[in-house]
Amino acid sequence: MTSRLLETGSTPFIRNTAAQQLADVQKQHPDELFNLLGRILPYLRSKSWDTRAAAAKAIGLIVANADTFDPNQDDGQEIKKAENDDLDVDIKSEEELLSPMDDSLLQLERLDLPSILKYGKRLLGSAGKEYEYSLAAMDPASRLQHQKKTLTSRLGLAGEYIEEDLINDNDLVSKPVVKEEPSFVASREHSIQGTSQPLASPIEPANGEESGLSKRQLNQLKRKNKQSARMGANKVRVVDLSSRRASENVTTPSVATPYPIKSENGEERNGDSKPDYFSLDRSAGDDESKIVSEFKGASVPENPLLQPESTEEGPNPNWPFELMCDILMVDLFDPNWEIRHGAAMALREVIRIQGAGAGRVQGKSRAENDILNRKWLDDLACRLLCVLMLDRFGDYISDNVVAPIRETVGQTLGALLSQLPSRSVISVYKCLYRIIMQTDLGLERPIWEVCHGGMIGLRYLVAVRKDLLIKDSKLMDGVLEAVMKGLGDYDDDVRAVSAATLVPIAEEFVKTRQSTLGTLMTIVWDCLSNLQDDLSASTGSVMDLLAKLCTFQEVLDAMKANAAVNPESSFGKLVPRLYPFLRHTITSVRSAVLRALMTFLQLEGEGTDEWVDGKTVRLIFQNLLVERNEGVLKQSLQVWSELLNSLETRGSFKSESDLLSHIKPLITLSMGPFGVPRYPVPMDASLFIKPSGLPFPSSAAAPARSSPASNTPEGTKGRRRKSEKKEAPPPSAHNVDGHMLQGDIDLVGADTMLRSKIYAARALGQLLFVWDQNQLPSLWQSILEGLNHSASTSQLASAMIVEEYAKLSGPSGRYASTLCENLRPIIEGERPPWYSDIACYLHVARAQCHSLLNTFRDHAHVPGSRLPVLAVIVQGDPEAGPNAFSLSDAEKVIGPDFERLKKGLTPAQRITALQVLNDTRATAESAVNEARNAREQRDLRVRAAAAGALVALSDIPKKPSHIIKGMMDSIKKEENAELQQRSATAITSLVEYYTTSAKRGPVDKVIGNLVKYCCVDTSETPEFHHNAMLEKSILSLRKEEDRRDHPDAAKFEREAKEARIMRRGAKEALEQLAVKFGSELMAKVPNLASLIERPLKEALAADELPANIRDPENELGQEVVDGLSTLRAILPKFHSGLYPWVVDLLPLVVKALQCNLSVIRYAAAKCFATICSVITVEGMTMLVEKVLPMINDALDVHHRQGAVECIYHLIHVMEDGILPYVIFLVVPVLGRMSDSDNEVRLLATTSFATLVKLVPLEAGIPDPPGLSEELLKGRDRERQFMAQMLDVRKVEEFKIPVAIKAELRPYQQEGVNWLAFLNRYNLHGILCDDMGLGKTLQTICIVASDHHMRAEEFARTQKPEVRKLPSLIVCPPSLSGHWQQELKQYAPFLNCVAYVGPPAERSRLQSALPNADIVVTSYDICRNDNEVLNPINWNYCVLDEGHLIKNPKAKATIAVKRLLSNHRLILSGTPIQNNVLELWSLFDFLMPGFLGTEKVFLDRFAKPIAASRFSKSSSKEQEAGALAIEALHKQVLPFLLRRLKEEVLNDLPPKIIQNYYCDPSELQRKLFEDFTKKEQKALQDKVGSTEKADKEHIFQALQYMRRLCNSPALVVKEGHKQYNEVQQYLAAKHSNIRDVAHAPKLSALRDLLIDCGIGVDSPSEGDLSGASYVSPHRALIFCQMKEMLDIVQSEVFNKLLPSVQFLRLDGSVEATRRQDIVNRFNTDPSYDVLLLTTSVGGLGLNLTGADTVIFVEHDWNPQKDIQAMDRAHRIGQKKVVNVYRLITRGTLEEKILNLQRFKIDVASTVVNQQNAGLGTMDTDQLLDLFNLGETAETAEKPSDAAGNEVDMVDIDGNVKEKGKKGWLDDLGELWDDRQYQEEYNLDSFLATMKG
């Protein structure tokens, strides 16, 4: 499964975790290396980027966990590191060491670049031919051989490459089978020169005959083969390729391929690792294979192809990864870009980690191996260079073109260069230099992709081998020359890479090449000025290079030198070249410009700031007004601040002349209003300037909202080129800002508009402060006018500007008094009647009122004279006068006027018009309310901003109520979070102002209100009085239920939203106070401390709560809850100096947890959890010492509830932080999972389910600091317990204290140890050992032991809790005798009562029940006698075959769950039979609530698992299913113990399962066809129905088909529609309906029995008389129906095999007699056969007397068949057990067997052998969770996908025509360019190289 998650994982986290898990498997099982790599390799070829990346990561991690290969390790020399080698190597000695075979490797010195470019096959996105399909159809070894054979040609090294047709005519002619000559497979040595060798010599037709096929037929066959090859191409094949060493000569067999690949049904053809009992697939013909199960003995697995094969001398001497790299190196040249990409990533990982061992061989000297290593790496370098030259694939998805292949190959080359000696690095560099320069490659014209590839290679060379660059001056010069050429290239993508190449070595280059700096800087600046295109890819890279270079003084000196020679090169001329990019359409470019400008502003030196002027100021400010990206906005403000500093330093503020003309428009723009949705107010575009300084044309302000196509000029669809040097028109610099300029709130959003106003206000505040400090003439006039502007947004902006200015200047500013005078009226006076920017709301209200009056006129026929007249102009309009339409007019119309007019209506008018009038009035009322709300919101904003400004100016009157109200209203109601934060800051400043003044003023009241607002949201802070009566419930559970539908959902949602806003504002203010005052918070604001502390001390000082706490007028209870809630809200922001104060409160919080009121416990639990997450050491210590002991308080349920609720919240609040403490919590929570209180139990099981999943992670976590020695000791004890719980093998040995009359096998002793462990910790579990392993015996041992120990304890202490209690065993009726017999045999000292039989018999036994040791009864009796069994307290309650309570609604299940017992145990060989919901029912008996409620379980587990089974399930659904099954498995793991027979019984002979097919008889076929014709239509109509009758009809039809498979006699009876027709048919044949000729299964059964020697005539001669002849085999024959048993008995035994002696066991046999029949069959060998029904004979019985099992019929439920066959295959069986399944070919029976397979897979994944311990998951099991009918390995469909197209829908929603392609079908996936940013980030790549 884990490797499936590489593909299906929906998030990088899941995929990376899967990769990590696979690496862990390798760490723990080093021998799995090649198997793992082989399984991951196919995912490198996936179409999905993420899958390939995850697979490469997995390979990297696995390879890192493998040992480094160094054959000369013992020589005592280290492998020389590439950096340490010397440049001059002794070449002669090397030549001597070369072996002849090295000629086959490519050599850097001899690489023919011109030939490669001239003749090499270009690598595009995909091949575009059937070539790749044909390759996919080959088996892997042949494919590798073919590709290596053609590689030299494809590289262009053997002249022009001509594509050969893989499917040639000879392939289509059948060839005589002759032994082929050996051919080389996968041999690297022959990869270059192998072109002349054919794969296998074509065989001439015998006697020179023609092939017998015409040309037309040949062409037809060829097309057909290509089609099937194409369909095979999508398969992901697990490269579990059989072990064939590459360099060995291997004979390719001519018939069967020995390479097991994934077959269509997802099963591997060489067998599966886990026993799959029912693997049938009709399409593959009959499954004649035998499945040998539980075969013990050393199996010899085939090695994977990736594993080098051993030689006669021993293990293979070569580098272990050589074969894999061979495959990957061939894939580097695959026509499909995805395959090239995956191969390059994998090679990068392998070479990075294991490259030093490549090419080395055991038995050679260190020197020889070093040369072999270099040769091998050189060869790979040559291949990578070839890819860089030939690759032409580019992706135009993001800002830049990304060439994923060239980038990844560049990284691979980087990884390789770190391993290469200097000499080879120089050779690589020389090749790259030639590729970039393209001067000597014989090209007619430069190829930009080739140059781009070379540049990428150079970039990684420079980054990885900086050491060589510093040493070798020629290398540095060459790199510089190449980069300069690249920067001047006509292609902007080449420029981008060139710029990025220089960034890592900028420092070295600047220090060593000062002479070339001037030239370089000229090129870089020219590069920027040439970027006319708005979408130029290289802009950001060039900008970053520029910013980096300009941080060096040497560069600045060079620029100054340039400027001295050429005035055009001065800073003043150069920097303005960046301005056009400030409003570039690409965010990253805008950000890069600001970074560059920031760098220039921070430069020191003469002339560096001459570009800083009024134009710059204006352009940066324009950024603030129109930028929508918050990150760029912040950068712009930083640049603005730096700009003002720079201007001040230069003295630009000494006179106003330069800047004033630029500043005034900015003030006007900042004050400009903006509108509301649908009614925008545009900015004044004429006040903007272009980068050139010219005014901005107003016509271009907004982009028209047209379709994108209309804006796209012709001819832009191809590659962006700069070759045609036409004069491009200058781009529209503000195109990106059109919507902001238009004020288009619908598209931009009001919050974005407000944010830009806030940033503009902050910038202007800074400017005004500097302006006023320089004593310049006042600019305040226009700003103060804004305070009286008709638009609210202008007033808001003006007030914010004043506030920002005041924050810097304080109360002592020059204009402070003037500002205060202008602000006070806003706070104290009336607001204007309306605002112009929301006049639209009033227009809508007027229109609705007008409509209402018209309704009176038109519908109620009220004369116009009686209707009021509405003014046309509304308040807020420019020409509005005193009589304009106002809000009060609107309220009058919908209020008094409406009532007056309604009163005047006649009854008749009322009847006709009232409904319409009421509806129209409601609409009008809604419009009026909306207008009122808009107006109130604007008033609130302006007042809050003015109040904030007054606080900043410290103009606080003696009665500050107006100011406080302005800010507090904003805290309460402001929807915009940023404005609310500003008000919170102002409140904080106000509180600070009062804390420093003599009088505290209103601080306490303000703090009190903030605390109150913080607690207003009932979802966070519950109401005390509303919940005061709850004592014995846990409020956390109630609050989950409260989230139901409310009667008035809209009103509830509105109120909840208001409460959330209020809490957000108050919390923000309190947090800011905590941050501002730090450790002095409680001293400065003692009221806050008192509001938290006082109620807790008052309420909890005594042992009991105050008696009057529940009185409605008593507020103490609410104050306690509020105090705890407030502490929880602001604690994360507390200064650490306040922690001791909080720790002092902890005992009170613990006391609150013990309180008898649910609501206080709830608040305390949440508060305690937060304290633990912030002050972890003290909090957790208190938890362990004080809270956890409460959880076991048997006497006080409130203590237990408080503790468990606290733990529940702790888990949710601390998340990962709880890991070091998990171990402390598990055992206490575990103990409460069987609590008598339902709510404690529910919360404990929910918490435990979360904790148990964290336990495996806990061990690796270091000890948290500050834990006391005592706690650490305690943790070790708990760890021991957890280890025992998770691994049965670690459980302490349990000495059985009673004399059990049996010798326990080791695994049975382990089982008893586990049961004793559960007993000791009061846990409950399921013993689900395989059938026949002795579950009964293990149970008897623990029950008898526990009874004995309780009796001893009682004798010693007389404690009532250990008094004698009976134990109850509930089992199916046929097993009651079996239990009595086993108890008598193994524990005769126990007094056993069998509570079975008829009611009279049972009533006689009732009095004996309480005194018995063991009571055995059946499920039916449990249901019927519930009132007898319920009152008894049982010690153990054991459910044998416990899966019988799988249906939670069945009466027997409900009855069993009512029984009270100390210990609950389920025995079941098959706990999951059909679906996982059954497991929920079992756990609902064991530990109710552990798996959540049934609904929760369904949603979380059952539905995703079921959904993942369907063939059309998406990869998302498959992942959800895989994750759900994994989570469920981990959660139930500690409570199930399962061992399989093949694991523990070495002495058990194998079980062989065979399918025995028989063809339907003529009569059966006829009846099938008639039934199908007549019933099919009716059945199709009913399949989707939910009607009970329809379901029954379908069920009956299925039953009919099943019966017909067995014998026509079961269906053709009187009343059957074709009864007479069939009778005539039989009469004509002289036959009868029961004749075995018509039921082939019966004749097959007879043949089978005779083959087994059953029913054959006894030998006529010899010592034995016929009577005493015993058959060599004895059989169990299972049928589903009793009727079928009758037919077998009468037609086969009585007529055909009369000598067979048989017994019969079915439902007609009384339960009490069944065990006798079993005993007779086991002990008397003269009985040949036992006939059974699966339902009666399939459970629990021991029938080891038989060694043959025959299924005449099959159950839908696979576990019933498995149970049945294991009646014979169990302990005591000495012979091989043969299981035969009789199947009627081509019928419903095959469908049943296919369905069985899925059910078995689910069951074996949730409950598997791991439940014997949490070991490492079996890799095969991790890999395939669901082996369904299709290839589960891939999200793509298998090769016969065309057959699954029924009902598929195409992209337009129409039903797909079969075989027809959709227009999107061939499109690869689209992805997010973040994948590129993450994958191709140079810094992260270098980090991995170091790591």
Curated annotation (Swiss-Prot):
Question: Which Gene3D superfamilies does its entry note?
Answer: Leucine-rich Repeat Variant, P-loop containing nucleotide triphosphate hydrolases, Tandem AAA-ATPase domain
What enzyme class is recorded for this protein?
hydrolase
Q: State whether it acts alone or in a complex, and with which partners, per the record.
A: Forms the NCT transcriptional regulatory complex with nctA and nctB.
Annotated GO molecular function terms are: ATP binding; ATP hydrolysis activity; DNA binding; helicase activity; TBP-class protein binding
Q: Which residues are recorded as binding ATP?
A: 1329-1336
Chain's role: Regulates transcription in association with TATA binding protein (TBP). Removes TBP from the TATA box via its C-terminal ATPase activity. Both transcription activation and repression require its ATPase activity. Part of the NCT transcriptional regulatory complex that acts as a key regulator of ergosterol biosynthesis and the azole exporter cdr1B. The NCT complex binds the promoters of genes linked to azole susceptibility, and especially represses the expression of cdr1B transporter.
Determine the domain of life of the protein's source.
Eukaryota
Q: Where is the composition biased (Low complexity)?
A: 699-710
Which Pfam families does this UniProt record tie to the protein?
DUF3535, Helicase_C, SNF2-rel_dom
Classification via InterPro entries? ARM-like, ARM-type_fold, Helicase_ATP-bd, Helicase_C-like, Mot1, Mot1_ATP-bd, Mot1_central_dom, P-loop_NTPase
Region span, Disordered: 184-216, 241-283, 295-316, 699-740
Q: Which residues cross the membrane?
A: none
Domain Helicase ATP-binding per the UniProt entry, residue ranges: 1316-1489
Q: Where does the UniProt annotation locate this protein?
A: Nucleus
Where is this chain compositionally biased, Basic and acidic residues type?
Answer: 264-275
- What residue spans do the HEAT repeats cover? 30-68, 473-511, 569-606, 957-996, 1139-1177, 1181-1216, 1219-1257, 1526-1565
This chain's protein is named TATA-binding protein-associated factor mot1
Q: Where is this motif: DEAH box?
A: 1440-1443
Q: Which controlled-vocabulary keywords does the entry list? A: ATP-binding, DNA-binding, Helicase, Hydrolase, Nucleotide-binding, Nucleus, Repeat, Transcription, Transcription regulation
What's in the GO CC field? nuclear chromosome; transcription regulator complex
The record's similarity note reads:
Belongs to the SNF2/RAD54 helicase family.
Name the Enzyme Commission number(s) assigned to this protein.
3.6.4.-
**GO terms, biological process:** negative regulation of DNA-templated transcription; nucleolar large rRNA transcription by RNA polymerase I; regulation of RNA polymerase II transcription preinitiation complex assembly; rRNA processing
Q: Which gene encodes it?
A: mot1
Its source organism is: Aspergillus fumigatus (strain ATCC MYA-4609 / CBS 101355 / FGSC A1100 / Af293)
